[in-house]
């Protein structure tokens, strides 16, 4: 596979991972708990995310409430907000940097400098994946630890939500895509010019007398 194809494939993976990271950041399903009371009519499921919590009744009715106070949130939620939003914004910067250094664009003159720009964009994407992985694993560790804690009531035990799995998949795509972009750019760092070759045909000049060569006539 050519270096340009590697860059394009890596950029596509990074874009999909970026969308998945935004989705994981906004979904209120980082922690999910399902419990049943003695009366099945009161069965409900509670979802908790970074920005709101939702309660889904057995009848299908869902009620969500946005967190009112930032200071009242737990430290892991505040840190997860900062790291996840930072990763999303950094991925946006990485997108522009990668597009500027990609071989299929003309934002930067072809050469080793252009390859280094693309290499920087791929490294930023990989950093985004690692940055998003920190709050995801931190949250998962807290949920699992509290789930097996005998002192926590059964009604307050949570399980891993779908947003965590989406975030893990997005982080993997960002790191893999960033690695592919770096591989495609690394191949071109030693080339003086890696732009697509364009062949030009030489124009025919007239003779000194202004007349065309006689052999052009039949």
UniProtKB/Swiss-Prot annotation:
It is found in: Cell junction, Tight junction; Cell membrane. It comes from the Eukaryota. GO terms for molecular function: structural molecule activity. It is a multi-pass membrane protein. The chain crosses the membrane at residues 8-28, 82-102, 123-143, 160-180. Gene3D superfamilies: 1.20.140.150. GO terms for biological process: bicellular tight junction assembly; cell adhesion. Residues 29-81, 144-159 are extracellular. Keywords: Cell junction, Cell membrane, Membrane, Tight junction, Transmembrane, Transmembrane helix. Residues 217-218 are annotated as: Interactions with TJP1, TJP2 and TJP3. GO terms for cellular component: bicellular tight junction; plasma membrane. Its main location: other. InterPro entries: Claudin, Claudin5, Claudin_CS, PMP22/EMP/MP20/Claudin. Residues 1-7, 103-122, 181-218 are cytoplasmic. PANTHER family: CLAUDIN (PTHR12002). Belongs to the claudin family. Directly interacts with TJP1/ZO-1, TJP2/ZO-2 and TJP3/ZO-3. Interacts with MPDZ. Plays a major role in tight junction-specific obliteration of the intercellular space. This is Claudin-5.
